[in-house]
Amino acid sequence: MDLADILTKAQIVPDLRATNRWEAIDELIENLVGTGKIQPGDRDAVIAAVKKRETSMSTGIGFGIGIPHASTDLIYEVVGALGRSRQGVNFDALDNQPVKLAMLFLVPQGQFQKHLHTLANIAKLLHKAEFREALEKAGSADAMLDAIREFGKR
């Protein structure tokens, strides 16, 4: 599953307020609740699932990228939210650099292959310096989504 298949403009947060990975996860999950991708009553359970995964090993993979993710039986399709932080978020990343782009995604429980495929596609796209630069320079969620669509075709 490609990034453009997961995101809408409403699921892009161009100015994350978070200062650490836990706040970033909360903010992105709150976005998914606000956009109707997660039921309000499931919010805490989804946060717990993502934080459990994040506690086992940071998803700050370097190059200013964080990809918090989890599997849960509370959703029926892959959902996600992308956040951008201009100042950077402490994610305890592998390279000790702050995360500027955080892509949170959730996969339905039991869909291991889809989980791996989605994670690989997101990581591959975000590792492209030109793509990260386009997202960082974009002036709005619309412009960020345009960049996602453009680079996703390449």
What residue spans do the PLM features occupy?
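Cytosolic covalent-transfer regions centered on His/Cys nucleophiles
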Residues: 1-154
